[in-house]
């Protein structure tokens, strides 16, 4: 059974107070970044543990492998986003060239 000593209770209460203070401050968006970072690190730990158990690697090499896989995935995501941004820019810059007639030319062609 886990026992809570005074230091653990004080530390967790200070973290809770800090989170509440940040939530009500103008820097609320930083909580999203913090949660995304914690989620990313959790996924990294899952990959590290899977690599360590599957290939029986030491902890150091499993961390290096997990970080390498994460960087490769981040690179692929960034390349995909860049390709989509370039495609959207090309679509915005595309101008369809249709003939423009002046009034005189339209009258002549209809006779």
Swiss-Prot record:
Q: Which residues cross the membrane?
A: 6-26, 31-51, 59-79
Q: Which GO terms describe its biological process?
A: response to antibiotic
The induction field says: Both transcription and translation of this gene are induced by treatment with ciprofloxacin (at protein level).
Give the UniProt entry's GO cellular component terms.
Answer: plasma membrane
Upon gene disruption, the observed phenotype is: Increased susceptibility to ciprofloxacin, cells no longer filament in response to ciprofloxacin.
**What is this protein's name?**
Ciprofloxacin tolerance protein
Please give the chief subcellular localization of this protein.
membrane
Lineage top rank: taxon: Bacteria
Q: What keywords is this UniProt entry annotated with?
A: Antibiotic resistance, Cell inner membrane, Cell membrane, Membrane, Transmembrane, Transmembrane helix
Relate the protein's function as given in its record. Answer: May play a role in cellular filamentation, especially in response to ciprofloxacin. Increased expression confers tolerance to the antibiotic ciprofloxacin.
């Amino acid at each position: 059974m886990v026992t809570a000593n005074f230091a653990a209770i004080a530390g967790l209460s200070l973290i809770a107070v800090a989170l509440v203070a940040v939530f009500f401050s103008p820097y609320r968006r930083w909580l999203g970044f913090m949660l995304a970072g914690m989620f990313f690190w959790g996924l990294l730990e899952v990959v590290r543990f899977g690599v360590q158990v599957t290939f029986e690697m030491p902890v150091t090499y499993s961390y290096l492998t997990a970080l390498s896989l994460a960087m490769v995935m981040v690179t692929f995501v960034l390349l995909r986003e860049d390709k989509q941004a370039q495609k959207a820019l090309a679509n915005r810059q595309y101008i369809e060239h249709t003939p423009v007639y002046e009034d005189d030319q339209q009258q002549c062609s209809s006779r």
